[in-house]
Amino acid sequence: LVGSEMCIRDRENLHSNNPCMNENKKKIAFIINPISGTQSKEQILKWLDEKLDKERYAQEVIYTERAGHAVEIAAQKAQEDAHAVIAIGGDGTINEIARSLVHTKTALGIIPCGSGNGLARHLQIPMEPKKAIDIINDGLIDIIDYGKINDVPFFCTCGVGFDAFVSLQFSKAGRRGPLTYLEKTLLESLKYRPETYELEMDGSTLRYKAFLIACGNASQYGNNAYIAPQATLNDGLLDVTILEPFTVLDVPSLSFQLFNKTIDQNSRIKTFRCQTLRIHRSKPGVVHFDGDPMMMGENVDVKIMKKGLQVIVPRDAEKDTSNVLQRAQDYINGLKQINDAFVEDIAHKNKMILDKGKRQFKKLTKM
């Protein structure tokens, strides 16, 4: 199913309404990344057919076919004055769609299907697709800020240093998902060396030796890992988090606070807010924007763009409805993922050692 010429149909012809014949209805385009996450996209289409309000909306379903395809599709839908473009995918798909909708009348909607789902989580959009469809029917349209890193838009977080390096390694991995990300994080953290950065912001200059520098428009990377827990999407400011060099003894507290929304209280963390930030480093390297890696030069300019994107959000969403029990559950879930990754990594290393021992034993027995 290709591009903009398709009128509301999918592979199973589930959708009987044709947007070309329903001019009075609000037009919504659903852009699906077929390879994101593990959720069945065909099942999501069935739920759409069952739950979407067909009296109000004429829907169109389009599959992406390559990297960057969602940018093109969303731009065309914005030109056609679609009411909304709904991303069915992960943070990368959301970024591609949202960058084409900034400063237009077309709103972004999200049915999260990715590994992290950072923006969806910050907006309190349910992780269950059926409930996310309810938000499209009953939600409100809010206007949020977005950021740019060397003129590349981001909507959740961007950064340099270790998190960007891990994003690069993760993009090369055959497997996807949170456990793969944690595995890469644990393995690479043993080898990664902090760099020295010069930061210019709002008229002042500072130097830091840092493990990573994260700039948050939203509060989290995804999977409820809150790198900028105080960040909001409509304050016109970047929340900058600097993680200074640390020891292995700091890892438990950093992990605890990352998932408990209190990492800004750690002694190894420095935070500040600004509208613009220039990061100068000694050599070109990788950066990340919304979890996707990109190579950039020595100078990295980050800035906030105020109130540039319309998004569909839950009607009853508040600025922060989390409570102590929810934070505790988030932390437990986070620790379980870390523990699972540790166990998987240890088992893998033990297997490698065992295999090596077997090979050496065979060599010795042949002598």
Labelled PLM ranges:
Residues 12-85, 318, 325, 329-338, ...:
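ATP/NTP phosphate-donor binding region
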Residues 55, 103-107, 111-215:
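Catalytic core of DAGKc-family lipid kinases
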Residues 70, 92-97, 118:
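Short glycine/serine/threonine-rich phosphate/pyrophosphate-binding segments
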Residues 159, 214-228, 293:
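Glycine-rich phosphate/pyrophosphate-binding beta-alpha loops
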